[in-house]
Amino acid sequence: MGTEFNGLFDEWAHTYDSFVQGEDIQYKEVFAHYEDILEDVVNKSFGNVLEFGVGTGNLTNKLLLAGRTVYGIEPSREMRMIAKEKLPKEFSITEGDFLSFEVPNSIDTIVSTYAFHHLTDDEKNVAIAKYSQLLNKGGKIVFADTIFADQDAYDKTVETAKERGFHQLANDLQTEYYTRIPVMQTIFENNGFHVTFTRLNHFVWVMEATKQ
């Protein structure tokens, strides 16, 4: 993952929270049950947590309230500024991304929501291989993101978006790197993880991978 999305992140920073609240009709289904999705990620995490894509701090706040020690990584300067306004003053967010980041001393869980699709499938594999080296046996990766059961599910979702006049959503689905469950299952298993997938809305699945 390079810096190609940083401009988008900065632009989106000031409207992101309205998106997750369902105020944009095109993305309402993408963010359906948003709070439940965040809670599910929190409940599946434990110990010292490395969070990629802090964004405006919504998941971070829930992790902190649940007593987790959190190390936050966020590439967008604008996102970091907004998150710092919402989070405890002593909490620090480090600039970085899924592939380039400062490694904390000890990590039990790696989490992210609505962000892993910014990596190509090859980059996803590189990232998971790196995380496998950071986690001990029993350590976890818990990612919530838009993925698809198979190619047919993806094709139908894009077609439906176009039929409903949701051209921005359709373009998003066709230009970013939304992957398929079999691809992610292979990536996780090849890097020493047992993984399960739980669907929480039409778009979003929670991937819970445990290091073997």
UniProtKB/Swiss-Prot annotation:
Family annotation (Pfam families): Methyltransf_25
GO biological process: methylation
SUPFAM superfamilies: S-adenosyl-L-methionine-dependent methyltransferases
EC number: 2.1.1.-
Gene Ontology molecular function, alphabetical: methyltransferase activity; S-adenosylmethionine-dependent methyltransferase activity
CDD domains to which the protein is assigned, alphabetical: AdoMet_MTases (cd02440)
Top-rank EC class of the record's enzyme: transferase
Chain residues that bind S-adenosyl-L-methionine: G53, E74, D97
Entry keyword set: Methyltransferase, S-adenosyl-L-methionine, Transferase
InterPro entries per UniProt: Methyltransf_25, SAM-dependent_MTases_sf, Uncharacterised_MeTfrase_YrrT
Annotated family: Belongs to the methyltransferase superfamily. YrrT family.
Function statement: Could be a S-adenosyl-L-methionine-dependent methyltransferase.
Protein name as catalogued: Uncharacterized methyltransferase BC_4369
Taxonomic source organism: Bacillus cereus (strain ATCC 14579 / DSM 31 / CCUG 7414 / JCM 2152 / NBRC 15305 / NCIMB 9373 / NCTC 2599 / NRRL B-3711)
